[in-house]
Amino acid sequence: WITPVVQNASGYDYHGYHASDFSKVDCRYQSGDGKKSGDVMFQELIDKAHAKGIKIILDIVLNHTGNFGEEHFCKEFDRDTRLRNQADINACMIPNLETLGSDYPGLQPGYQYQRRLAMMKNTDGQNHDTHNYWHHFGNFNWDLPNRWWAQIAGDCVDLNTENNTVADYLVKCYGNFIKMGVDGFRIDTSGHISRLTFCKQFIPQFAALGKQYEDKRLNKAPFFMYGEVCARFGSVQYRGQDNLSPYYYTWKAPKDLMDGFDGSQSYWDTQEIYDSGTGYDAKLMPLCEKDNADSPESNNTFMLNGAWHEPDYSQSSGFNVIDFPLHYNFSSAGSAYGLAKSGDMKYNDATFNVVYVDSHDYGPQPSDGIRFSGSDAQWAENLSLMFTFRGIPCLYYGSEVGFRRGSVIDKGPNGPLSNTGRAYFGGYITGDVEASDFGEYKASGNVEATLNHDLAQHLIRLNKIRQAVPALR
């Protein structure tokens, strides 16, 4: 997947997860001469990828905005897109003094942050967010359902996705990308939104748009959605709780809870909520926490008596997930395989799990803050399992050469990116590649050396095997 492309704003927003305007592509994606907007350039990317038989999976964020407001819900800034240096947040972001106050420019950075936050979630004891576009929840526990309502980081201000106005706006904005032809969504921080909310507010809506605009996608393939239900834990069930486990999101929510879900703006306008209080509204958040029934099981992933059988998707939510339990056990292929065999019946269909060894966030346990540190032989074994087992293989850039092996993935703003697992990989792929067939090519420049790496060659062979054997796909 490619990381989010909507307009961002923060002091650390290179990755796209701090939205300030969901309705447009970030101005930093405009053409070098400024004649083509980011939206036009992104459409060109989709079209050119499709012309080469490549699908575009777009990372989207439903859970939160950045901490600089949002153009539609709380306009705190104007952006000067004419400035070449868009990384200089103080120069390109012009504060809306009507919203932030005339004294805002003279405040120290920490107080400026608190002022911005107060306008979004009532942290100063005043009811600024009268329509409840954001959640106003204080302390939370990563291992309890109240993680659905809380701000998980200073630059990730939690949206009230139970509010129809918020959900409808997000569906409209991201629906525009479906109309442009993106082939699927990877949905960030899905584990910080309840399953009930997904089933009521997002999955059916995106699925309907996907069906409506199927002609825009490569080969009219079904629109694919999968979520990041983060579970940094060694078992398939997350700390004894079904409703916080990735597999739970692959199943439909109960009909009685769906029928009782009323996120109308007229309701939310009656709620006055502060994070110094309970942080809960009168009915929607408690209703979501009632979605905690035991999860069913399925044999959709398995053959029966050595034969294929028609899968039963009658209880599928239409949503798939990143296989966090498998990812977390990829310290060895044997450990990952054993875990999957013991737990795949918990997913509606684990065939659609997205599987990776490491990512831009985590590596396998026990040291999940670093990129996979194993040898090339260990990498090759893990990749062999990924490409010949159930699920959809996913590679983080550079894994094909063991790039930044063992490096700390995210040091925040405390050091250059070049010293982290998120370092720039572009230098490895400069040069030219001319493909004559699947896995057959001629290359020159740095990319030739990259493709000649032992792991890259192993991946080419695995891809050829997977392409030749339909059962593996």
Where would I find each of the regions flagged by the language model?
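Hydrophobic faces of well-ordered beta-strands that scaffold small-molecule active sites
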Residues: 2, 56-58, 185, 225-227, ...
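Substrate-binding/active-site clefts of carbohydrate-active enzymes
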Residues: 4-180, 201-212, 224-238, 243-319
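Active-site-proximal helices and loops of the catalytic beta/alpha 8
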Residues: 46, 50, 64, 172-179, ...
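Domain-wide signal for the mature, well-folded portions of proteins, strongly enriched
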Residues: 5-6, 24-32, 383-394, 459-462
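Conserved oxyanion/phosphate-binding beta-strand-loop segments in alpha/beta enzyme cores
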Residues: 1-7, 136-142, 337-346, 350-353
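Active-site clefts of carbohydrate-active enzymes
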Residues: 155, 350-373
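Short, well-ordered beta-to-alpha junction loops that form the rim of enzyme active sites
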Residues: 5, 60-61, 189-190, 358-359, ...
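Short hydrophobic-aromatic micro-motifs
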Residues: 155, 355-357, 394-396, 402-403
